[in-house]
UniProtKB/Swiss-Prot annotation:
Subcellular location: Cytoplasm
GO biological process terms held by the UniProt record: L-histidine biosynthetic process
Job of this protein: Catalyzes the condensation of ATP and 5-phosphoribose 1-diphosphate to form N'-(5'-phosphoribosyl)-ATP (PR-ATP). Has a crucial role in the pathway because the rate of histidine biosynthesis seems to be controlled primarily by regulation of HisG enzymatic activity.
Natural source organism: Bradyrhizobium sp. (strain ORS 278)
GO molecular function terms attached to this record: ATP binding; ATP phosphoribosyltransferase activity; magnesium ion binding
UniProt name for this protein: ATP phosphoribosyltransferase
Record comment: activity regulation: Feedback inhibited by histidine.
Length: 325
């Protein structure tokens, strides 16, 4: 008998709150039967799923080892921690929170340094003048090496940062940094600026699957159910349901509504009594309502959608294709 599917989520702070809220909106309610300090949890109604509460960096490591099936973590940690990440894990879906950029930042006093090409010139001149390589403080060692290599920069050495990376140039432990930032305000406060082409990665929280986990029948079915919930919620959030009834509706009018307002008719054209159900992007609701009334509709009602369940689930299809490849 196969073991449970293990879903790893961040164990503290805003990331944990956002992850739990994300799953909750999809009808997947995470709970800790052992209390708030427990590092194991469950999903209500899914017996074959175990929640593991880990740090975001540990989640990336456990995905690489295959000890968890699915995990919520930042793409920056996936790319940094996992060698050949695209072969070993699948970024199933972005989750809409935890957004931040991994960037190259230099002192604002370096007024002539705006690009990576400028930095390459500075690096060469720095070594000639000081007889040592320029120091780059960072926690993102692998991302830094790859990005600098792509720009042909070799005259530098990495100083691994264990604390507040943005303070390294000010205290003299590095000339520049590679760090993650969401607004850039902390960098500015420390006298730093991001190079014009210095964004290494635009990261956010992702739902990630491990190739090396045990994907036997039980965990695979649990993953299908979880991804079905997530896709149904995501699909619903893109639309509002519009209902109306009038005799003047025909295929040409539906085609025009689709082309102008992006609507879909999930149940086909109007019924024999003229009832019509459409799914419409929220920003187009008023325009669609005006269009329908102009064509003879007396009343148009609009309702929010909780879930839209399709026969096919592209998220699970992506996972299946990845595991077969």
């Amino acid at each position: 008998m196969s073991g449970p599917l293990v879903l790893a989520v961040p164990s503290k702070g805003r990331l944990q709150e956002n992850a739990e809220a994300f799953f909750g909106r999809a009808g997947l309610n995470l709970s800790k039967p052992g209390g708030a300090r427990d590092y194991r949890g469950t999903i209500s109604g899914l017996d074959n799923v175990e929640i593991a509460y880990l740090s975001a960096s540990d989640i990336a490591s456990q995905l690489a080892r295959g000890t968890v099936h699915l995990g919520v973590t930042g793409e920056d940690l996936v790319r940094e921690e996992i060698t050949d990440a695209d072969k070993r894990v699948l970024l199933i879906d972005t989750l809409g929170f935890g957004g931040a950029n991994v960037v190259v930042a230099v002192p604002q006093a370096w007024i002539d340094v705006r690009t990576m090409a400028d930095l390459d010139d500075v690096a060469s001149g720095f070594r000639a003048q000081h007889n040592r390589r320029m120091r780059v403080a960072t926690k993102y060692i692998n991302l830094t090496r790859g990005f600098f290599a792509s720009h042909g920069i070799v005259d530098y050495r990495i100083v691994e940062s264990a604390g507040a990376t943005e303070g390294a140039p000010a205290v003299g432990t590095a000339e520049l940094i590679v760090d993650i930032t969401s607004t850039g305000s902390t960098l500015v406060a420390n006298g730093l600026k991001v190079l014009d082409d210095g964004v290494i990665l635009r990261s956010q929280a992702n739902l990630v699957a491990s190739r090396d986990a045990d994907w036997s029948e039980g965990p695979r079915e649990s993953a299908r159910i979880i991804l079905d919930h997530i896709h149904a919620r995501a699909r619903a959030s893109k639309y509002r349901e519009v209902r109306t009834r009038f005799k003047g509706c025909d295929a040409a009018m539906l085609t025009e509504a689709h082309n102008r307002f992006g609507v879909v008719a999930p149940f086909g054209g109007p019924t024999s009594s003229g009832m019509l159900t459409l799914h419409c992007p929220p920003a187009q609701i008023y325009s669609l309502g005006s269009f329908l009334r102009a064509h003879g509709a007396e009343t148009v009602s609009v309702a929010s959608l909780d879930y839209v369940l399709d026969r096919e689930n592209p998220l699970f299809a992506r996972l299946e294709a990845f595991l077969r490849s």
